Amino acid sequence: MVYSSSVDISASSKALNFNSYHYLIRQSIYILIGFIFGYIAFLIPLYFWQKIAPILFISGLILLVLVLVPGVGKEVNGSRRWISLIIINFQPSELVKLFTVMYASDYVLRKSKQMRTIVKGFLPMLGIIVLTGFLLLLEPDFGAFTVITVIAMGLLFLGGLTYKIFFSLLFFAPISIYYLITLQPYRLDRIIGFLDPWDDPLGKSYQLTHSLMAFGRGEFFGSGLGASVEKLQYLPEAHTDFILAVIGEEFGLLGVSIIIILFAFLVVRMFGIAKESIQNKKPFSALMAQGIGLWFGIQGIINMGVNLGLFPTKGLTLPLLSYGGTGILINMIAIAIVLKIDFENRRNMRGQFY
């Protein structure tokens, strides 16, 4: 789908030497590297991730700071989210998502006896998330901030945070979101465009209306692989944030339904693996699997919702499907860690302790 959704934009780009296979080749290389790093991650014992989780998270914060440094961070489409490594633009926020899962899992276990208190259990983690969010909003990357917040707060709740504190947080969340939206005019424009996309189809709602037209043209069975019209440079970011719209146009409701079912199965299976870890008395492994499940689940829901016009545009990719070097690499490492957790669960069930 990366090739199908990017073939026109790459074939017509002088900067890409009019190579229609540009994005396909790069994504294939990223996937190959992802398999290598994923295999390495699979070989690493889970207790090692827990041991170095705080160091990894601090390293992630340092990378978020470096993104903001002129000459280090690279600005694309008005956002400074990348660090240029000559052959690849590295996006630290993707790495921070994984590090947040590790750190929050370790934090919950270290603070297990204090998780039901506000001062010692909740506030320290809240302060860390606020700091992370501040750095992300300076880029700005509201989508990554949303995902990381859900991961951290979700793991705190699963780790024993009281219902009173959790639902109090849910009460104040809309107020914070409203403030963040009104803080930047472009976010307010996105909300206005989302509420009535056909009021300004050539302006604020251009991306959304073309996404909806793609789904409409696909109908039930789609127009066929490679037959999308919207990917012909009508729909911006067709190979990244809006790849689901291209899938909807080429494979119809049937294709989109299959994608949704596969994502649901993946997330449910991750939580199933977490349940097995709990039964094997491996709380860190359980929290890691739950955290990665939350990450893939919330990012998938937001991306699909944006494509379908259910949420305002966020700038989030669809895990495992959208084009993006850092994204696919980190996604594959995360999947490898979940496979490692499942592998250890099966060994324990057979009586082979690792």
Which role does the model predict for each range below?
Residues 1-3, 7-139, 304-319, 323, ...:
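Membrane-helix boundary/helix-loop-helix interface segments in multi-pass membrane proteins
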Residues 26, 53-63, 151, 258, ...:
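Hydrophobic alpha-helical transmembrane segments of polytopic
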Residues 34, 38, 101, 105, ...:
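Alpha-helical transmembrane segments of polytopic integral membrane proteins
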Residues 54-61, 122-135, 142-182:
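Hydrophobic alpha-helical segments of polytopic membrane proteins
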Residues 74-82, 165-258, 283-288:
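Hydrophobic, glycine- and aromatic-enriched re-entrant/interface helices and adjoining loop segments
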Residues 138, 146, 222, 257-261, ...:
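Hydrophobic alpha-helical segments of membrane proteins
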Residues 146, 151-165, 229-255, 315-329:
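Interfacial segments of multi-pass membrane proteins
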Residues 254-298:
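Hydrophobic transmembrane alpha-helices and their immediate junctions
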